Amino acid sequence: MNITLFCSVFILISLAGLSVSDDVPGNYPMSLYGNKYSCGVLGENEYCRKICKSHGVSYGYCFNSRCWCEYLEDKDVDFWAAHKNHCKNDKLYPPKK
């Protein structure tokens, strides 16, 4: 009886943990040529972090041999779109009137 109760409680707690997932939205950024950035060192690395910062987000890592940026929105996936959205240079991108 005690074992059955223990197993039931354990299964319920396990299922509750599955429903609360920590999936973070993100995207693979695209280079000037429309390709995903390749990376050789899986996991956290400085190269992917720099790529993600150039696309306007603060964190990224190598996943599936491509740089993955957490919280990268669809509008910033393309290299030039990201720079246009985040560039502070008024001469390059004059403010809209």
Swiss-Prot record:
The protein's assembly and partners: Monomer (edited version) and heterodimer (non-edited version) of this alpha chain and a beta chain (AC D9U2A2).
Signal peptide extent: 1-21
Tissue expression notes: Expressed by the venom gland.
Main localisation: secreted
Functional description taken from the UniProt entry: The heterodimer non-edited LVP1 induces lipolysis in rat adipocytes. Induction of lipolysis by LVP1 appears to be mediated through the beta-2 adrenergic receptor pathway (ADRB2). The edited BmKBTx-like, similar to beta-toxins, may modulate voltage-gated sodium channels (Nav) and may block voltage-gated potassium channels (Kv).
Pfam families in the cross-refs: Toxin_3
Domain comment, as recorded: Has the structural arrangement of an alpha-helix connected to antiparallel beta-sheets by disulfide bonds (CS-alpha/beta).
Keyword tags: Disulfide bond, G-protein coupled receptor impairing toxin, Ion channel impairing toxin, Neurotoxin, Potassium channel impairing toxin, Secreted, Signal, Toxin, Voltage-gated potassium channel impairing toxin, Voltage-gated sodium channel impairing toxin
Keyword Disulfide bond recorded: yes
CC annotations in GO: extracellular region
Domain LCN-type CS-alpha/beta residue range list: 25-88
Entry GO MF terms: potassium channel regulator activity; sodium channel inhibitor activity; toxin activity
Family membership: Belongs to the long (3 C-C) scorpion toxin superfamily.
Subcellular location: Secreted
InterPro entries: LCN-type_CS_alpha_beta_dom, Scorpion_toxin-like_sf, Scorpion_toxinL/defensin
SS bond list: C39-C62, C48-C67, C52-C69
Name this polypeptide is given: Lipolysis-activating peptide 1-alpha chain
